[in-house]
Curated annotation (Swiss-Prot):
Effect of residue 43 to S: Shows weak residual activity
Purpose: Catalyzes the formation of 3-(3-amino-3-carboxypropyl)uridine (acp3U) at position 47 of tRNAs. Acp3U47 confers thermal stability on tRNA.
Residues binding Zn(2+), per UniProt: 31, 34, 41, 43
Protein name: tRNA-uridine aminocarboxypropyltransferase
UniProt-reported outcome of changing residue 34 to S: Complete loss of activity
Domain of life, source organism: Bacteria
Outcome, altering residue 31 to S: Complete loss of activity
Pfam families in the record: DTW (PF03942)
Protein family: Belongs to the TDD superfamily. DTWD2 family. TapT subfamily.
Amino acid sequence: MTENAVLQLRAERIARATRPFLARGNRVRRCQRCLLPEKLCLCSTITPAQAKSRFCLLMFDTEPMKPSNTGRLIADILPDTVAFQWSRTEPSQDLLELVQNPDYQPMVVFPASYADEQREVIFTPPAGKPPLFIMLDGTWPEARKMFRKSPYLDNLPVISVDLSRLSAYRLREAQAEGQYCTAEVAIALLDMAGDTGAAAGLGEHFTRFKTRYLAGKTQHLGSITAEQLESV
């Protein structure tokens, strides 16, 4: 199966690593594509979908390495998803060019309460050109840092998603009400943008991932050990 943008970014991160990366469950032997325990691999269930919306994942340092990351699920379902390592001072040239691409309407996905008063904030994708949803993918403190310290994104509007239901995701607990995982927000954005088929496909993929990930945690698969540690 073709590697998606997040897996490619993960491979690049591993290639420049200088020390072992010890995520939770690092002794479990995992599928190197879906990062679930091998016995719970879901790669054969992945079914890509079509959407006019496009996603750009701006990922904090080791985020692509984490089995709990859900940005990878977006790239599984929407193959034209792009992913970049975040940098405050040296952003990827490809990222800068994508943000300036006149074929899209770029916007930063983040809660409205964190935007400055002068920042344009919207709550639904605008009509017209396809939206480019820029998602800041990391822990909540990391996402806040990326939002504050990415001057090359400061001129873009912020789109804020208010999910009325409690988050279904409990792999890594949010630190405050109204904070949701990356894939969950993407599902809502796709639905609001009219990409209902892609929203349904990502929702199904997310549910399968969540179920199998939590099953792997519950089983405490300590006897299924990895042959080698990844580096960071």
